[in-house]
């Protein structure tokens, strides 16, 4: 550890609170990471604290008075109760915390710009036509500047005027201690895994987080007026592996400590080379198969392994058993004659999604993303929010809904014959 005189040494690496990783991207956005819009965002201790905490509450404001308070050069949250009455809560500087804001807006208060994830999209243009359901100022994360650097999540973010407005139609209420609280239109949902983010992890229960960071059971639908029941024994404190859903994109929170136990990209590359060094062969063409470099994630290579998803037999690409009368991608496996989808295999390159450092022996179905057995087993159990009131398991590397009984398959490679 550092000795006290090193604490303020300028060359000391900045403290990392954790990282947010967007589900559905395999290491980077399709057209590359740019500025505040990327697939992974690291939260570091700021040179100067920018956190805020609630202070003065103004009750029974007229709209004009509320506007005057909101126009002051400090943060505030306005709760519109009726056309004649607004409650404004002023927020004051908190020197003990750092604030990070996430949303769809590209305005300067947003630290991490997140847009809707389209399953399996290969370019940002695929996402442009979609009507976004992510809030412009979706949520904020407040991190304590001193150990253990606790991170807490709150619904809604402050806009360029340092305000959060909850209009007449937003769900809002007065709490038992006389404070105000509310929910955003489509809500911010959080799920904390049981047993942390490890090979023993199990899914937790999805909850909704309020503007003040309280925890509620889910509403009947995403934007219903009626809030769920308050869950007093749970908190808005993020833990390693917590999932944050913004209604259009889901983020994985990894703590700095958790990431230190996660396989590195270098480790995943070594596993790729190890598989290729074993020279797996296509049982039909006897040609050697090889997983392409991790930098090439969307163009099928001629040596690329393909798999029959019903049985797991790995082949090179060939036309054997391709009968025209069959629908779509269904093919008959030459090894065992089972009929099912036949897809190329892709290595999962986003190391933050792995729950262990095991070899890439299993693939998600139907997309063909390959990773460790424990990682496929974990993600296949996680019900991810989809639309306004449904949930389904999806591949973390591309966001495709999983298919089949398990949602993943064990790969059966044929070794070289020599």
From Swiss-Prot:
EC number from the UniProt entry: 2.3.2.27
Gene Ontology MF, one: ubiquitin-protein transferase activity
One GO process term, biological-process aspect: T cell proliferation
Phosphothreonine PTM positions: 127
Pathway: Protein modification; protein ubiquitination
Keyword Cell division recorded: no
Main location: nucleus
Reactions this protein catalyses: S-ubiquitinyl-[E2 ubiquitin-conjugating enzyme]-L-cysteine + [acceptor protein]-L-lysine = [E2 ubiquitin-conjugating enzyme]-L-cysteine + N(6)-ubiquitinyl-[acceptor protein]-L-lysine
Disruption phenotype: Peli1 deficiency suppresses inflammation-induced neuron death in substantia nigra. Promotes antitumor immunity in different mouse tumor models. In addition, Peli1 deficiency alleviates inflammation and reduces serum IL-1beta.
GO cellular component terms listed in the entry, alphabetical order: nucleus; site of double-strand break
Phosphoserine modified-residue sites: 121
Cell compartment(s), UniProt: Chromosome
Keyword Transferase tagged: yes
Post-translational modification: Phosphorylation by IRAK1 and IRAK4 enhances its E3 ligase activity. Phosphorylated by ATM in response to DNA damage, promoting localization to DNA double-strand breaks (DSBs) and ability to mediate 'Lys-63'-linked ubiquitination of NBN.
Record keywords: Chromosome, DNA damage, DNA repair, Phosphoprotein, Transferase, Ubl conjugation, Ubl conjugation pathway
Ring-like domain, as annotated region: 311-399
Domain FHA: 13-200
Assigned protein family: Belongs to the pellino family.
Subunit note: Interacts with MAP3K7. Upon IL1B treatment, forms a complex with TRAF6, IRAK1, IRAK4 and MYD88; this complex recruits MAP3K7/TAK1, TAB1 and TAB2 to mediate NF-kappa-B activation. Direct binding of SMAD6 to PELI1 prevents the complex formation and hence negatively regulates IL1R-TLR signaling and eventually NF-kappa-B-mediated gene expression. Interacts (via atypical FHA domain) with RIPK3. Binds preferentially to the 'Thr-182' phosphorylated form of RIPK3. Interacts with RIPK1.
Known function: E3 ubiquitin ligase catalyzing the covalent attachment of ubiquitin moieties onto substrate proteins. Involved in the TLR and IL-1 signaling pathways via interaction with the complex containing IRAK kinases and TRAF6. Acts as a positive regulator of inflammatory response in microglia through activation of NF-kappa-B and MAP kinase. Mediates 'Lys-63'-linked polyubiquitination of IRAK1 allowing subsequent NF-kappa-B activation. Conjugates 'Lys-63'-linked ubiquitin chains to the adapter protein ASC/PYCARD, which in turn is crucial for NLRP3 inflammasome activation.
Protein name, as recorded: E3 ubiquitin-protein ligase pellino homolog 1
Species this protein is from: Mus musculus
Lineage: Eukaryota, Metazoa, Chordata, Craniata, Vertebrata
């Amino acid at each position: 550890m550092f000795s006290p005189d090193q604490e303020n040494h300028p060359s000391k690496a900045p403290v990392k609170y954790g990282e947010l990783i967007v589900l559905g991207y395999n290491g980077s956005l399709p057209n590359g990471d740019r500025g505040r819009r990327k697939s992974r965002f690291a939260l570091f201790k700021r040179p100067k604290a920018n956190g805020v905490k609630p202070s003065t509450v103004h009750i029974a404001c007229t709209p004009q008075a509320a506007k005057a308070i909101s126009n002051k050069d400090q943060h505030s949250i306005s709760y519109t109760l009726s056309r004649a009455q607004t409650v404004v809560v002023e927020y004051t500087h908190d020197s003990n915390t750092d604030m990070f804001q996430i949303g769809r807006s590209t305005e300067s208060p947003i630290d991490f710009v997140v847009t809707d994830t389209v399953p399996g999209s290969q370019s940002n243009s695929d996402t442009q036509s979609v009507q976004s359901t992510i809030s412009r100022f979706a949520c904020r994360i407040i991190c304590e500047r001193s150990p253990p650097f606790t991170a807490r999540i709150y619904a809604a973010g402050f806009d360029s005027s340092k305000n959060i407005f909850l209009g007449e139609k937003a769900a809002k209420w007065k709490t038992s201690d006389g404070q105000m609280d509310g929910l955003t239109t489509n809500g911010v949902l959080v799920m904390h895994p049981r047993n942390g983010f490890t090979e023993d992890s199990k899914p937790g229960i999805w909850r909704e987080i309020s503007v003040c960071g309280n925890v509620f059971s889910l509403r009947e639908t995403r934007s219903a007026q009626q809030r769920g029941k308050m869950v007093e024994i749970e908190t808005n404190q993020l833990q390693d592996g917590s999932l944050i859903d913004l209604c259009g994109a889901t983020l994985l929170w990894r703590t700095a400590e958790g990431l230190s136990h996660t396989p590195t990209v270098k480790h995943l590359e070594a596993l790729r080379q190890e598989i290729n060094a074993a020279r797996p062969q296509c049982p039909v063409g006897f040609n050697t198969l090889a997983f392409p470099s991790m930098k090439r994630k969307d163009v099928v290579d001629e040596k690329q392994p393909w798999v029959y998803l019903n049985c797991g037999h790995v082949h090179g690409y060939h036309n054997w058993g391709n009968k025209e009368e069959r629908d779509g991608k269904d093919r008959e496996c030459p090894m065992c004659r089972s009929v099912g989808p036949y897809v190329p295999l892709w290595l999962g390159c986003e190391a933050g999604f792995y729950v262990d450092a095991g070899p890439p022996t299993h693939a998600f179905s139907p997309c063909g993303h390959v990773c460790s057995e424990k990682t496929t087993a974990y993600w296949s159990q996680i019900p991810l929010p989809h639309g306004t009131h449904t949930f389904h398991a999806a591949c973390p590397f591309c966001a495709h809904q999983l298919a089949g009984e398990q949602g993943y398959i064990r790969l059966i490679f044929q070794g070289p014959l020599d």
